[in-house]
Amino acid sequence: AIYAGTGQDGSNDVDVAALTYAVGPVTVGYQYTEIDREAAAAAGAADSERRQASIAFAINDNLSVSYGIIDTKLDGAANAVDEEITGMSIGYSMGGMTLNAHHNEGENMGGNALNEVEHTEISLSFAF
């Protein structure tokens, strides 16, 4: 599937193009987003270009895994470095129970070379 859109978010111009492709148990996706901030130069904010890619694999009816990356280039901000985010997840379901886990890491968040984040979450849910 191919998706595209353009519009405004307040005074920001936003353009998006994305595609997904599924074959058998594998799905891959790619998205490109560009944000042109009208007041970027005056406020010290940055325009941005974001590229996202992912792959998901359904190992069987109950177990699936996925991996994704996001690279964001910040244009115009003083001393800004590119953001890099990676994440992976796994999900297992059996009857009414679902166990999910994911781990994400971000480097240079907000264009700051000293800003790194990490998040891990495990959840268990039951449907009655």
Feature map (PLM): residue ranges:
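Outer-membrane beta-barrel proteins
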Residues: 1-128
